[in-house]
Structures are given as C-alpha cells and as structure tokens.
Amino acid sequence: MSNHLSGSEIRQRFLDFFAARNHKILPSASLVPEDPTVLLTIAGMLPFKPIFLGQKTPEFPRATTSQKCIRTNDIENVGRTARHHTFFEMLGNFSFGDYFKEQAIAWAWELSTEVFNLPPERLVVSVFKEDEEAFAIWRDKIGIPAHRIQKMGEEDNFWVSGPTGPCGPCSEIYYDFHPELGDKTIDLEDDSRFIEFYNLVFMQYNRDADGNLTPLANKNIDTGMGLERMAQILQKVANNYETDLIFPIVAEAARLAAIDYQKADEKTKVSLKVIGDHVRSVVHMIADGISASNTDRGYVLRRLIRRVVRHGRLIGIEGQFITKVAEVAIALSESVYGNVRERETVIKAELEREEARFLETLERGEKLLESILEKEKSQISGVDAFTLYDTYGFPLELTQEIAEEQGLSVDTAGFEQEMKKQQQRSKAAHETIDLTVQGSLDKLAEHIHPTEFLGYTDLQATATVTAVLVAGKTVESAAAGTEVQVVLDRTPFYAESGGQIGDKGYLTGDNLLIRIEDVQKESGIFIHFGRIERGIVTTGDTINAQIDRSCRRRAQANHTATHLLQSALKKLVDGGISQAGSLVSFDRLRFDFNCPRPLTSSELQQVEEQINTWIAEAHDTQIAVMGLEEAKQKGAIAMFGEKYGSEVRVIDIPSVSMELCGGTHVKNTAEIGLFKIISETGIAAGIRRIEAVAGPAVLAYLNERDQVVRALCDRFKVKPLEIPDRITALQSELKGTQKQLEAVKQELALNKSDALLSQAESIGEFKLLVASLGDIDANALMAAAERLQQKLGEGAVILASTPAADKVSLVAAFSPRVIKDKGLQAGKFIGAIAKICAGGGGGRPNLAQAGGRDASKLSEALAKAKSQLTSSLQ
C-alpha cells in the first residue's frame, strides 16, 4: 500500500486519474447551493442535480470534482466516532448519459488498487440485492469472490431523488481493517472493521407516482469518495481526525489548552475533535458568504461556532481562542480554496464577534443551569429550558447537550409549549402576500407566453394586451377609475428584479390612458400595475407602452453607481466584501454588504471620492451576454445565493467593475453626474448598509441640508462654520444643568429618606427598613439606601421606587454583621426579590440594585423582602 500520501496528494491523484479519462475538472461549488430545497451543499452531486433530473442539458459528458460539503444531521456523533463530520470533501466522477455501470466499476477498482495501491484482498463491495448486473460485473469482470460481494436492501443500496423521478441502485467499496478475522464474519455494519470509502450510484430508472420503474433513455453515473476516509486508510491512522487534513487544527486546540492529545482521556479527545471538525466548517461557511444569524444556514453557522466555544471551555481554554485555530484551518485549505485566505479578515471578525457574544451568554446562563442541574434528577423541565433560551440566550440544542452529559433529558414538548405561549404573547402583524394574484398568474401561465422584454433597447413599443386583472382576478375588460394589473405580449417596462425597482410610465390607446406605477414579474410574465385614467382596456387591445424616461435615467444612474460602490469598497476597504442585498430606486440607492465592522469616516470619504473620480473619468459601460463559466473566468462578480442561467448578462466598466446583472445602466459613467453617501449603518450581525444618492438627487439632497443649516444659523445667530462650536457649548451647558438637577434630586431623596428612619423595626440585634420612595431614579435610590444603612448601624435596608411607568428600581444595603453572622448577601437577595417584578439584578454583598418591568407587583415584592429578612435576622 502507498505510504502516507497527504490529503492534497490524494485529492490531486483522484482528479488527475479521471482527467486522463476525458473528465472535465470542475471547481467545488459554493456551500450555498442553487437548489432552494436545501440549506447547504450536502453532497458532491448536488451541483449536478438539475442535470440528473433532466432540467438542464450538460455542457460536457463527463466531469470530476472535489466538492466541499456540510452535513449536520449526525452532529451529536462528531468526535465520538472515527469518521462522522460536519465538513468533508467528496471526490466524485460523473457521467451524463455517457459511460455506465461496467466502466464506472472498472475505473473505481483501477483507481483503488493501482493508483492508491489498496490490496484487493482487503476490499469488500456491496450491491443492491436485485442488481444482478452489478453483481456479475464485480464477480466476473473484476474477479472479486462472490462471498466478498454483499447484497443489501433498498434502504442501503438504492438512490432516489424523491418520491418520483430518476433513481437507481448503487454499489459501495469497503476497506477491511482486520482481514485476519476471515470472510465468514463479514458484517459491513461493523465500522470498527469496515469503512465505506467509495459509492457508485447507477441512475438507470424513472419512478412514477405508482412506484413503477421505467429504464431511462440516458443513464447517468454519480460517485463519491470521502477524502478524509481515504486519508485515514492511506495514512494508517486510527480515525479521520488524525489525518493531516484535520489533526493540525486539533493539535493547535490542544496546545492552547495545554493538553497532550495522546495522553488525554476520551472525553477530552472528543472535545478536541469537535473543535477540529467544526472549525473547518465555520471557516468555509463564512468564506462562502454565510453570516451567523438565528435562521436557516446562518443558524447552522452560529450553532457550530457555539459548539466550538463550549468545547474549548470544557477542555480549559480561557477567553477567546477560535481565530487561532481558524488560522490553521485557513492555512490547510488555501491552496485549494483560495477564498478562505481572501476573506480571512471577514472570517476572523465574524468568529470573534460570535465568540464574544456567546461567552457572555454562557456566563449569564451557566449559574442558572448549574442550579437547575443540581435540583433535577432525571429531566430538565420545559419551563426551565425555555427560561434558559428566552432570558439567557441558551439554544435548546445546547441545553440538551449539557443535560445529556449529566445523564438528564429535556422536556422538549414542554419547551415547545412555552415557545407557543410566547409567540402568542408577542404576536405581531406580518406582511402578507396577495395570493389571489399569484393564483391567477399560475392559471394564466398555462395559456399565455412569457412577456418579451424590449427595455434594454426600446423605451416605447406597440404591444397586445394578453390579460387584464382586477383585485387579482382575470377580467375581460376594465374601465376608468379602476386599479388594474395588465399583462402584455411585449414591453419596454423593466420589472423589479436584482434590487432595481420597476419602471413607471403609461399605456395608451384609442381614448385610453393607464398610468403605470410599478412592474413586477413572475414566471417570465410582466405585470404592469396601474390606474386607468381614461377609457376602457380590453384583452386583445393593441396599445402603446411608454416608460417615464426621467425615472429610467435616474434608476440606471443609481444602478451603475451601485456597481461602482461595490468596486470601491473592495478596492479601499476589504477585497473580501461581498454584496448581501441592494435597492435601486429613482431617488436613491441602498447597498448591503458583508463587513464585520463599521466603516470609518476616512474610509467613507475615500470611497465617495473614488466613485466620483470614476464618474469624472467618463468610463464607457460595455454590456455582453455570455456563458456563466466564461463570465466567472473573466472575473465577473456574482452575488451569493443568486440563481443564474447558463447564459448571463455582464456589465463591464473596464478596469473598474465587472458584474453579472440584468438591470439597466448608463452608457458612460459621466451620465451619473455626482455621487454622495448619506449614511452607513449596521442592519444585522456582520452586515452593513450604505445609503447614497446619485445624479440630480445629489443636488436635492444638498439643498435639503442647506435649508437645515440656514435654519440653524437663524436660530443661533451664527455663521455656518460656527454651528458645531455653538452646539458643543449648548451640550456643555445642558450637561452642567443635568448634573445640578441630579444633585437636587439626590438631595431631595436623601432628605425624604431621613424621614424614614423612624419607620425602621428592630429584629433582635438588627434594624430593618423596607420602604418605597415614589418616583426617584436608581442613582438617588442607591445613595439613599447607603446613607440609611450607615445611620441605622447593623441591619438591612430595602428601598424601592417607580421612576417610570412599569419600571421598578430596587436597592438592598446590608451591614457587615448581616453578611457575616446571617450569611446574607445584598446582590443575591435583591436579585431574587426583583424576579417578582419580572426583573433581576445583583451587586456586591453589602450594596446592590435591581430592576423590574411589572410595577403592579412592587407591593408583593416588598412584602416578600420584609418577611424573608424578618425571619433571617431573628
């Protein structure tokens, strides 16, 4: 057997083997799939799924790839078994109606035994129990003894794309780690002896709704070899984690924890392996444009980061560490996946932010969880699990994981009940979609052709009305005063897409005038939304469609400016920045992008100046339609998550910008005129937003600001350049006045509190005072409590106030002997009392404050405090 091939060498030998057999080597697709039915790329065949389903014609008959994949369905097994992962690379060779079963099997055997030099006597294969053809090929053509060919059922060895559609049997090759055990006890489920490393899928049937199988005219091959598994075999290590693909990450985590991996106990090794696996996942997910969030693939990323952080704490790593292990993962991958190095800054910033946030979450919730674990013997209640989730940010999966480590379960049904209660309490209005329009369009699409778009070259056109809708329902005709949706056979109107809003304009005919305010499209049908100002519109009418040229000019200026903005951000701020969304309207533009931090004033100024320089340089805009792969090879920027056909439209401003885009644009950057950034803000974790204006809108924006400046000058009797100094002076005056007011409030509170001394009760050797001081603020309340405790001597003071509607402030002040002799602590005590008022808090043993949101419970809270302290001080 070949000795110690590196993971990189294994990958390259696989690709080279099939390239020599006329397979086109394709780069790995993004982890963000084009298939909307899955969150992440989970298999090597996923990018080719449209071909296998007959939805797309292949550009070549054979392909080979090394596809990065992420699966989290077995996340609880990661680190606990030898070969479960969330991130892995799937090596594959594919045939689209070209070679089939016999050739696929022959090449798989040749690759395994002659390229990777696996001893034939150590290989076992499986076939679908009804696939006699595959069985015969393995036995008669390859020469494998029949007893080493295992027949398996449909669950294990039959691939389906869904309830109906292409499907077929598969055959798997296993490596035998212990051939000395003999052939009489072959059990492929025994993963301590056998590891499946190569799967061959023979797509040869179509399954109909009744379950009947019909042979396909074009049969396909889909194979997958696990890179990590082959590395384990060839590098002769105990598990995938100890291969050179992962172990350097594990070793770095062990170094940070001051642990010797080889001497570590099994529990510690599990944590180290989890870190090694998950860090690979999160690095590649962020590199492919995914940001942590509470939904969809963003939540998968957040969950994986949090598991890394928690397992780091379990093995004794203090503070933030994840970027250190991420650096190793980046170094291991950059030669094959260059975007991990290109987006290193973004990756580290996202990891640092999420790690810091989760460390705060852990610190807040771990004490409560510890107390829950102490009192519960078998199960954490749904109420407690929901409190951890809702109040402390603990995901249910994390609570379940920790509970499992302690031998407990979690009442998930109870958790879901609490979640539903909260949703009912906080139910808010949601935007709804008018499905009546969609339903009508679905029916229309069966009878009318997609609209022909003319708007790239024509601003007006003669067209035929193919449908009229009123209130979402198709009608034969509609009269003046009616809000309508009109469908045409051809149109110059741009329909909203790619962030650019739809055109405005008019539809005219014999005594007909329809003012169009918006245009949308669905399934290639353009819907013109408007109001009939004059006349009657009828299906079949010939009309003239004319867009508002002024609105179009402004929209295309803003759209081209958006392209310039992205280029400037990449050039001046971070080359790894990518678009996360946009809006191009007639009067302004909005651009959302991945960036872990706010832009500085200097950066914003540089970006603005660069864009205006490009505008002044009068660059021509070149538009071309080409193949998607050709466009990418030329460097055209594509938006993550956007679906593109085989033919794409490329907007090229030479030496400045090149993007895939279906929108409308200026012919020369000089047409934009001017560009002005209005604001830069954060809209989500790791997502920033720039709003800007271009062209005539810049003058309108500056005039508006000029009016504000003039008004301020009149108000303060100063010149424009003197306004900042005048505002600073006013702020200083206001701050001084507020300090004086606070001092007066505090003095009043102290005077009022002194009058309470006579209300103090004697409890044995101690004094106890529990009282409410009206609406004074928290700072004054704290000062009053501290002063009263000093005047009372040994004892306890509890003060409360309601400084605002439904807002409660509470303070506890305990003397030294109350703390020492009675074992009471102000922080813990007042925090518990505050829960009655739907709040919390804490502080030092002698002085602490808390707050609450339910003022109606204040009397109950004070009564509880008095009762408990009376009992404790006796």
From Swiss-Prot:
GO terms for biological process: alanyl-tRNA aminoacylation. It is an enzyme of class 6 (ligase). Its EC number is 6.1.1.7. Its cofactor is Zn(2+). This is Alanine--tRNA ligase. It holds the Pfam family DHHA1. Zn(2+) binds at H559, H563, C661, H665. Keywords: Aminoacyl-tRNA synthetase, ATP-binding, Cytoplasm, Ligase, Metal-binding, Nucleotide-binding, Protein biosynthesis, RNA-binding, tRNA-binding, Zinc. It comes from Microcystis aeruginosa (strain NIES-843 / IAM M-2473). It is found in: Cytoplasm.
